[in-house]
């Protein structure tokens, strides 16, 4: 009897042990799913690389908001140009601010002027083109598209687009070389230098003094030094001449003024144009240069009455003008 009980107990123990082994193995085994989750959690996310715009912004510098946002970072000047400004016409005018004695030209006189516009060539390149038009056609005519495609405006400067402001989409370009260099926008051309008897520009003695931006214009002041052949002026005898220039960049109205044909009986300055038509003909027109005067009282103006303009023509008299001359200048 004892032998049977012992045999039965051993049988139960063997059965229990057989089933217990798999249970203990399951306890020690690692869950492959959990390991995968741990690996995903510990995996480092790739670091976001800074673009050139973000790297430059970290350097700080000064900032002005206006027609174009202007940044001055270390020794360089930058414009942030919005998409809306591409293709818009701007008038660039450069004048003398101060000149050497006996230079032959006076402060306030014009150095050059140009109508320009910005054009994006690709994601990395922007052009500054001169709007050089002497041929035109009625926009409603079929030939106007042919005139547009068959002609092209000169590129006066090329910018590298450094990057974009991700919030505003404005494109950042470096304008330092544009305003420190000699070109038709902000300095002298080779022909201009010959006329005023200036030699080559001295880069190490040429500086951008200030760039100030306003709602519809930007003002750039530069100090320039040129080599010079000895002449009658004391400055030229030193072998160099230094002068100060100011360049104004003014945004022109989006809707251009209605052109008016010249009449030889009235003394206006004019601009000559060749106008093409669908009839395979062309004619020479002269468009006068005039102020954009819009009558304040249009009904009275239509009746032939003298009325005031919406925007007055304003002349500024230099505060250095002798007081006894001022009344006569106003008259």
Task: List the model feature ranges, each with a label.
Residues 1-4:
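Positively charged n-region of N-terminal signal peptides that target proteins for export
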Residues 23-321, 327, 331:
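Auxiliary tRNA-acceptor-end handling modules of aminoacyl-tRNA synthetases
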Residues 19-20:
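Intrinsically disordered, low-complexity polar segments enriched in Ser/Thr/Pro and acidic
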């Amino acid at each position: 009897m004892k032998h049977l009980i012992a045999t039965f107990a051993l049988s139960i123990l063997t059965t229990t042990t057989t089933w217990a082994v798999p249970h203990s193995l399951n306890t020690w085994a690692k869950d492959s799913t959990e390991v995968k989750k741990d690996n995903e959690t510990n995996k480092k996310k790739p670091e976001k690389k800074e673009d050139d715009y973000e790297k430059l912004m970290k350097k700080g510098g000064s900032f002005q908001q206006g027609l174009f946002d202007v940044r001055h970072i270390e020794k360089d000047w930058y414009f942030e140009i919005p998409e809306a400004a591409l293709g818009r016409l701007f008038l660039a005018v450069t004048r003398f601010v101060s000149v050497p004695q006996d230079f032959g030209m006076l402060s306030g006189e014009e150095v050059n002027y140009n109508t320009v516009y910005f054009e994006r060539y690709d994601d990395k390149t922007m052009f500054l083109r001169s709007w050089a038009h002497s041929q035109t056609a009625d926009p409603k005519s079929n030939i106007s598209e042919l005139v547009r495609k068959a002609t092209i405006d000169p590129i006066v400067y090329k910018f590298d687009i450094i990057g974009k402001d991700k919030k505003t989409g404005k494109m950042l370009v470096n304008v330092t070389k544009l305003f420190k260099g000699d070109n038709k926008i902000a300095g002298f051309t080779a022909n201009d230098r010959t006329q005023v008897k200036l030699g080559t520009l001295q880069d190490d003695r040429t500086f951008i003094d200030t760039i100030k931006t306003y709602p519809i214009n930007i003002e750039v002041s530069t100090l320039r030094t040129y080599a010079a052949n000895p002449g009658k002026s004391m400055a030229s005898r030193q072998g160099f001449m230094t002068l100060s220039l100011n360049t104004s960049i003014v945004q022109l109205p989006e809707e251009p003024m209605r052109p008016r044909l010249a009449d030889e009986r009235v003394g206006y300055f004019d601009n000559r144009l060749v106008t093409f038509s669908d009839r395979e003909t062309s004619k020479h027109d002269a468009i006068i240069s005039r102020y954009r005067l819009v009558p304040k009282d249009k009904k009275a103006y239509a009746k032939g009455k003298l009325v005031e303009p919406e925007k007055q023509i304003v002349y500024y008299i230099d505060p250095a003008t002798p007081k006894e001359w001022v009344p006569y200048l106003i008259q």
